[in-house]
Amino acid sequence: MDQEYFIGFDVGGTKTDAVLFTRDGEIIRHVITPGANPLDVGFEEACGRYLHAVNALREGLNVPIRCVYGAVACLEYFKTRATDFMKQHVPEAVVRLESDGNCLISAMIGHQDGACMICGTGSSLCFRQGEAYGHIGGWGYLVDSCGSGFVLGKKALLAIARAEDGRDGPTLMSKLFEERYGESMNSHYEKIYQGGRPYIASMAFLVFEARRAGDRAAGKIFDECIADLSELVWTGYRRFGGAYQLILNGGVFHHYPEYVQALRAHVPPQVTLVDSDAPPVYGCAVEAMYDAGYSCGPEFKKKFLSGYNRD
């Protein structure tokens, strides 16, 4: 059988992680290009960036592409428009572009029913049931980003502000803030507003470090955020009608294992929490293979990750 070639790419707000690979999992080319959340940069600009990543993979290589699969943050609001765009530029391939939850699920359990919970700057629970796909929570930081790094950081800043006002008692988070940034929060306001959501999310460490030292305010924030995240899991439990597998992904879960431990203690025992050990773009590869009628076994994953990590 002639060799077959596939493209998978994962798009976030910061970067696009794209791979060209073969049917047996060998990565031929791996590129990192600028991110392209269509809500951030606009739909036309975003599509141009997706195409740039695909062209960077194909440059100088005259190989036919069997399938193209792209996972893109916030693409669910644009229906099939991005897929239709890409089909025009890779007409020989089966093309599917969709939101980024499915690839996280597939990276760990293959193309089957399940869910993933992302907890980084933002948060949400994405689910897949047959052909149905959607999310619970994750309506953006202006509406709902429960338990996320941004919410943790924002609540920490509010606790510090309340302590400085005298509305609440002192909190260790004030001291930790000054140690990290070299000035009080009151003197740091310009930088906070300039940095915006990602900068505030980076301050989530205040909650975890202060909580470990027994700080009451930090403990309260931690518990509130765990309650919000567990609500997402319980809502998923009702949607699935019982047990399901939940893949955990995102920087907050990765850096703060106590957050995962606390979540485990507050969700239904029938829900299996699975720590992700593969990058989202591997899930894109699994989905591209699925569109060609192939499943990905252990050898495929081993070869793919070996090539990916080497890059």
Label every PLM stretch briefly.
Residues 1-65, 84-90, 108-115, 158-311:
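ATP-binding/phosphotransfer module of carbohydrate and carboxylate kinases, centering on a glycine-rich
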Residues 6, 10-11, 69, 118, ...:
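Short glycine/serine/threonine-biased micro-segments
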Residues 75-171, 305-311:
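Phosphate-binding/catalytic loop of phosphoryl-transfer enzymes
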Residues 67-71, 96:
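Short, conserved beta-strand segments within well-ordered enzyme catalytic domains
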Residues 72-76, 250-253:
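Short loop or secondary-structure boundary microenvironments that flank
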